[in-house]
Amino acid sequence: MVIVFCGVLFMAETASILCPDKKVLLPDIHAGCPMADMITAEGLRQKKIEHPGATVVCYINSSAEVKAESDVCCTSANAANIVEKLPEGRKILFVPDQYLGHYTSTRTGREMILWPGFCPTHTRIKSRDIIRLKQEHPQAKVVVHPECRPEVIALADEVLSTGGIRRFASSTTATEVIVGTEIGMLHRLRKENPDKSFIPVSEQAVCPRMKLITLENVLWSLEEMEPEVKVPEEIRLRAKAAVDKMLEVG
């Protein structure tokens, strides 16, 4: 069986980690994640030496090598639940997204050491734009992704993962929703909820790496059966342990 991943590299790697018997293709091998590139396995190993005994909580938006150096993975949806279930008093090192880590720390009341990574796309979402849009659309609800800066999160009615934003868009009684996440998400929201108006906080919130995946290179990838993403077995097993721990705990 073949999996063609229309996303970025860490997503294809995660598919390879979980499904080693399947051929995983990424139509453009240059479709990486800038945030995932802000941390290396060697850098994380050094940080672990600086903080002995710390539990490493790794956002799923990271490379296979970084996952392999971590104790447990998390998503934006379950990060708080994962952290809450760690033993009280345990030192926590959260990588690589400082803003998801900050939001998770605020929600759980747990102090954490935060790796200084971030999503460039979500940092283009500014609080001043939300303030302006709320003035223009006073009845609108504001929903943002937890990869946004704290001052943006403070202005939101809801802070949700991508899946959570979809569910909120369907369930809310509001007819206007101001959305703070990657702008491609709005296409799906509008398609699924044609009776509602979805307003992007910023037209600049575009992930250029994701946009490298096109219908043309998906077709090419299927025809040529490449480029294949295959995580080396030694790394795969260690990374899978962190993912399995997330599924067990979260």
Predicted regions and their residues:
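Active-site loop-to-helix "anion-binding N-cap" substructures in soluble metabolic enzymes
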Residues: 1-160, 164-179, 186-187, 191-194, ...
